[in-house]
């Protein structure tokens, strides 16, 4: 059964804007980011997603863990990060439309943190803030059936991937299939669904914007709960995705020195190219500046003419 939601004018406008920005990303070769930028964005993703859940480690500490350096911090926080690093490094090994793959990802993400890692919950749960019960999840014996239906929905080829990713994220949070780790799994799986059609999402840290607008994130979940459909959450998440793509494009269009431009371009891995190809990546560059850049690259033995 298809989960309930409405396509509002705001959703249509955001989908149009996102599609245009993805086109610009592809035209600028931004799906092939430099290794350094990919690493930075991966760190932001892990830091932001875990920060939402109360993890106290900084981006610098996460960088150190990626580089196999020792970090002093709460044991639980360190383990959460180490698990997340392993999972995000093998993102393309998971199948977004498979519940078995979903459970495997949860097992690896929560390994050593809870006894029931990789298993759906076998007890009732509710989300309490202060003294107020914010959300009572469906009975535990309904969880396998509800999740099976949700994964069937993911296989619907008529649904837009952008919409599907948001709907899955919301419905999964509503079902609350695990005792712990639901939030980080929702964000991880939305990334995976988006990656199935758009390569840029493998390294687009939209979680950073969720972390900065956390109150709006939870408000959109609550409003969707109250209305009985995921429309509010879809609007929120599409807005986050649109702004994250805008940030990526702004970063690419920033003022760079010739060495920075050359380094960035070389990291794209384009083996044979001409001045026009170079200028396609750096849209605001004059032909004279592009020629000077490429001449400098030859003089530095970074390029062959």
How would you describe each model-predicted region?
Residues 1-305:
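FIC/Doc superfamily catalytic core
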């Amino acid at each position: 059964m298809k989960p309930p939601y409405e396509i509002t004018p705001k959703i249509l406008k955001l989908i149009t804007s996102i599609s245009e920005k993805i086109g610009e990303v592809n035209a600028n070769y931004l799906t092939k980011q430099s290794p350094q930028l990919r690493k930075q964005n991966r760190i932001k993703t892990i830091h932001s997603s875990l920060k939402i859940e109360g993890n106290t480690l900084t981006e610098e500490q996460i960088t150190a863990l990626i580089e196999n350096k020792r970090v002093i911090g709460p044991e639980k926080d360190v383990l959460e990060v180490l698990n997340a690093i392993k999972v995000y490094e093998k993102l393309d090994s998971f199948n977004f439309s498979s519940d078995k793959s979903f459970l495997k990802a949860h097992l690896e993400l929560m390994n050593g943190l809870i006894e029931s890692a990789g298993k759906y919950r076998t007890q009732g749960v509710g989300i309490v803030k202060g003294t107020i019960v914010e959300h009572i999840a469906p009975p535990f014996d309904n969880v396998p059936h509800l999740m099976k239906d949700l994964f069937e929905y993911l296989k619907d080829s008529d649904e837009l991937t952008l919409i599907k990713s948001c709907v899955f994220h919301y419905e999964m949070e509503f079902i609350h299939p695990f005792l712990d780790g639901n939030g980080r799994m929702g964000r991880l799986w939305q990334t995976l669904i988006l990656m199935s059609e758009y390569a840029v999402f493998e390294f687009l840290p939209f979680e950073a914007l969720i972390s900065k607008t956390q109150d709006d994130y939870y408000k959109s979940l609550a409003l969707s709960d109250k209305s009985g459909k995921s429309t509010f959450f879809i609007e929120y998440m599409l807005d986050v995705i649109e702004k994250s793509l805008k940030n990526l494009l702004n970063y690419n269009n920033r003022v760079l020195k010739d060495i920075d431009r050359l380094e960035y371009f070389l990291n794209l891995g384009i083996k044979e190219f001409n001045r026009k190809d170079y200028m396609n990546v750096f849209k605001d560059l004059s032909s004279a500046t592009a020629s000077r850049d490429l001449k400098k690259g030859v003089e530095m033995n970074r390029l062959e003419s």
